[in-house]
Amino acid sequence: RDASLTVQEALRLANEKRISIETASAGAKIDSGDFTFDVLSPRKELEGDNERSLVLYTQSMGAKILMTGDLPITSEMEAPPDCDILKVAHHGSKYATSDEFLQKTTPEIALISVGANNRYGHPTERVLEALDSVGATVYRTDESGCITLWLSERGITAQTYLDAPSSNALLAAYTP
């Protein structure tokens, strides 16, 4: 399905439901009530859908969280913030998440949203090895299904499951 048609459909639906659409760019802050997100990208000078991916940074309960959208290596920030939780860019593509970026962000937990047996081979071995080299614990939706993180003053608790939490639950705790 054509991505531009999906966007047009979403905009039409938002208009129909009277939902306001706002454009964010680097330097903006988004307040959702529970969290305040710093918008790190897109930068105005970037072109292309992936290059203009929304990149958000927030902190909660002492945990630093960086969400990178589909940001390619060519558009990575020169000085990315250190983070405890990283949503890995572009499903772990070879065109995203450089070794240098990971050395600067040093995530403890890396989340990869990716479909099982996808035709692109995501996530790539290079990205998985780079995440391993910085000591990140990797959670992948193709292997674990839904990934839920709970943040508390005691640390981060992760639960993953494909079907039901009672049958396939895996819990892990981290202290940032």
Regions found by a protein language model. Give the residues of each.
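Non-globular, low-confidence helical/coil segments that flank catalytic cores
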Residues: 1-176
